């Protein structure tokens, strides 16, 4: 699988991933002498950065972090490459000084520690040779402040019994918006829908598959849903109630994305 990225510091590197779900500061977050992770929020306390592709949402902390990262790289204890959702100036400066390849605009929520990765900042790509990517759409339907969720039937191929929004696979070079509208009509019978927003793709992980989820927000004037065979139950809920349900991977993040679209 290949993910598009934005190159920040030129270079190419390969290795196994070390993934943190939390923003990271090299000041206090890593041992400057050994490159061992100290920050428990990363989920990787004790892991060493050397030779790893370090993926985390963004950097934080003081400008001293640039020099900590530079020192790690100079002593051979720094990461082989850095992958971010959003590049932070402190990390970017440190990576530049240390000559560590760096990219951003990658949703690190779909990556896992020990994934085999190849980062090419010159081309703006991140490759995961052992992972299969599948492009899908997810349509969030909204009516009077509530959103529609559906429970998947036992007849579908994946995530049987889990709660989801309206979703479907993108075929070939099909336009994602067109596919989203088709799925809404087929799965709910609703036709008078109005597109209100989109967001950057969310990477939802299921073992060795990453679903590249293209999110859409539609308003609908009514709640008269007619389910097809793919789903067996539906509810209209407030977005903040979603965490009460057993959902498909990262549905909460997809909903958050369409209500707060990226710039």
Residue ranges and their predicted role:
Residues 2-11, 17-127:
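Feature captures the catalytic cores and cofactor-binding loops of soluble hydro-lyases/lyases
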Residues 77, 189-190, 247:
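Helix N-cap/coil-helix junction residues
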Residues 131-148:
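Conserved N-terminal beta-strand and adjoining loop/helix that marks the start
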Residues 143-145, 201-225, 235, 239-240, ...:
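Active-site-adjacent beta-strand/loop module that shapes the phosphate/pyrophosphate-binding cleft
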Residues 146-186, 190:
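Conserved Nudix-box catalytic region and its N-terminal flanking loop in Nudix hydrolases
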Residues 190-200:
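A short coil-to-beta-strand element that immediately follows conserved catalytic motifs
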Residues 252-263:
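Charged phosphate-binding loop/patch that engages nucleotide di/tri-phosphates or the phosphate backbone
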